[in-house]
Amino acid sequence: MSNPVSPLSGQEPLEIERKFLIEYPDPVWLERQPGSRRVEIIQTYLLSDGSSTRRVRSWTEAGRTVYIRTCKRRLSDRTRVEVEDELSEADYLALLKEADPTRHPVEKTRWCIPCGSHVLEIDLYPFWSDQAVLEVELQSEEDEFLLPPEIRVIREVTGDPRYLNSSLARELP
């Protein structure tokens, strides 16, 4: 989710993040992390004009589902303008009619793990059993962070379009 920006500030809400391909994490380790949260996400991409990416999400945590609409516009490999709003279930279902037919819905389990002043978001996909994607949101592109030793990075994939969820949605069967 994007960094909050006051509507009175005149600034656009920015999402600044780095992304890593990691070895599939130990599920027991994920569950045991203090403050860890497990979220089931179904992400559907909507038709757009090409200047931005539009999607809707079903976000289920602890038996409660919320629906979120997101519009993203790329500024750099690490930074995007991201505008989100919560939807009613009826509005979510109506927007599904605008789904991009060239992309499949992406289902994933997201683990949110507090780590110092950051939150690690680890996405587990049903089509991968040996790797996962880790994202960390930052306050600036220069912001530094440390990953726990239990996280084994294969490589950084920030800016690699193959690891965008919107790209994965095109590759799914």
What is each stretch, according to the model?
Residues M1-P173:
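Phosphate-end processing signature that detects enzymes handling 5′-triphosphorylated RNA
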